[in-house]
Regions:
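Short beta-strand
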Residues: 35-37, 324-329, 361-362
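Conserved core of the PLP fold type I
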Residues: 64-207, 219-234, 380, 386
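Accessory recognition modules or surfaces
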Residues: 281-286, 308, 333-353, 376-377
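N-terminal small-domain helix-loop-helix segment of the aminotransferase-like
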Residues: 2-105, 112, 297-298, 304, ...
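Conserved glycine-rich beta-strand-loop-beta hairpin in the small C-terminal domain of fold type I
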Residues: 288-295, 307-319, 325-337, 367
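PLP-dependent enzyme catalytic core of the Aspartate aminotransferase-like
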Residues: 85, 89, 164, 345-348, ...
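Conserved core segment of the aminotransferase class I/II
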Residues: 236-308, 391
Length: 396
């Protein structure tokens, strides 16, 4: 028999994955071209050709004992150094390989970070709406999320005042996801500065260390003049969890890292802890081929303009029909107000028109729904009549 801890997780499967599986069933009946699947954040822009070429060359030329052998749990030194130098060139920092630990994607990065700082009963602050897998990660270590309510009137910016009110001596971290999944909001420098100043005051008041865990898989996916602040510039005790899944369209390859800035408290021991957690959690090390490829390709990006066009067209199309949407500044999600209180029921209405979406309640954001527009542009265009038929029932 499976454990009591796992049973509710097994049978309460992710709404995102559930809708994705529903989409496959509909596609088998109506044809995939007649199903408009906006459920899963699965990049559909191909990885850059240069990355593919790097992988092929590595397979042909690299010493097979190095390519397929064990390595440091923190990863290859040359990959860690290449990432540090890329960050230095972008943010004017002075990181080295010693500040970087390679991981099997952002989920792994989050887990080894939490394993390193959390004790049973500790609290971690999250800003709703948020990626609900955080709850599962926290439960792995006996810790609990403390949820800050969403504020549509501010564009879903973090509520610093409520955050301060909910910080206790048990608070170990605050999770920031910027650009945000599911809203597409980008938290600007002034918001990060306010949040950082508040946390500095709370650290001093309580005599504790409170980390910012900055979950940044969408960092490179920003539009127009939007910029993602480098949080260590504002707050020393920042831990950056990064993934190449979105920036290089590599979600299946599971490659990312944790950055531990040298100004954070006890950073050297923290890096050792992350490396040890990689081993303890059975990850051991990030995939070898992907590490070596990333070392050659840190400056590459996938086609952000493609996502920007999809987001703009979807936003304009739905707002013209009467829907209220948050205009995305980053990531590849459109956050839309449900015309009825029951967002799950409304998503079922959309499904009847063969449009697959994710209810906002799956992100602790009831009354909204999320559309993931990492789809073909034809899917965006061809879905408009289906959206329109539903909109006419509510907006005339």
């Amino acid at each position: 028999m499976i454990s009591n801890l796992m049973r509710p997780r097994v049978h309460g499967s992710s709404a995102i994955r559930r809708m994705f599986e529903e989409g496959k069933k509909l596609a088998s009946v109506y044809g995939p071209e007649n199903v408009y699947d906006f459920s899963l954040g699965n990049p559909n822009v191909p990885a850059p050709d240069e990355l593919r070429d790097a992988m092929i060359d590595i397979l042909k030329t690299e010493d097979p004992l190095k390519l397929h052998g064990y390595m440091s749990n923190a990863g290859f030194d040359e990959t860690r150094q290449a990432i540090a130098e890329d960050l230095n060139s972008r943010f004017g920092t002075s990181y080295s390989a010693a500040n970087v630990v390679m991981t099997a994607g952002a989920a792994s990065a989050m887990n080894i970070t939490m394993r390193s700082i959390l004790e049973p009963g500790d609290e971690v602050i999250v800003f709703a709406p948020y990626f609900l897998e955080y709850n599962n990660y926290l439960s792995n270590y006996g810790s609990v999320p403390v949820v800050i309510a969403p504020h549509p009137e501010s564009g879903f910016m973090p509520d610093v005042q409520e955050m301060c009110a909910k910080i206790t001596p048990k608070t170990k971290a605050v999770i920031i996801n910027n650009p945000n999944n599911p809203t597409g909001a980008v938290y600007p420098a002034e918001v990060i500065s306010q949040l950082a100043d508040a946390l500095k005051s709370k650290q001093e008041e309580l005599g504790t260390v409170i980390y910012i865990i900055s979950d940044e898989p969408y960092r490179e996916l920003v539009y127009g003049d939007a910029k993602v602040p480098h949080i260590p510039d504002f707050y020393n005790n920042t831990l950056i969890c990064y993934s190449y899944s979105k920036s290089l369209s590599l979600p299946g390859e599971r490659i990312g890292y944790v950055l531990v800035p040298p100004q954070s408290d006890g950073w050297e021991e923290f890096v050792l802890s992350l490396s040890t957690a990689n081993r303890m959690l059975g990850i051991v090390n990030a995939p070898s081929l992907q590490q070596l490829a990333i070392a050659r390709c840190t400056g590459l990006r996938s086609n952000v303009a493609f996502y920007e066009r999809n987001g703009a067209d979807l936003y304009e199309g739905l707002t013209a029909m009467g829907f209220s949407c948050v205009k995305p500044d980053g990531a590849f999600y459109l956050w839309v107000k449900s015309p009825i209180d029951d967002d799950a029921a409304f998503c079922d209405e959309l499904k009847d028109e063969r449009v697959l979406s994710t209810p906002g309640s799956a992100f602790m954001g009831p009354g909204y729904f999320r559309l993931s527009y990492c789809v073909s542009h034809e899917t965006v265009v061809n879905s408009m009549p289906s959206f329109r038929r539903v909109a006419e029932r509510y907006f005339g």
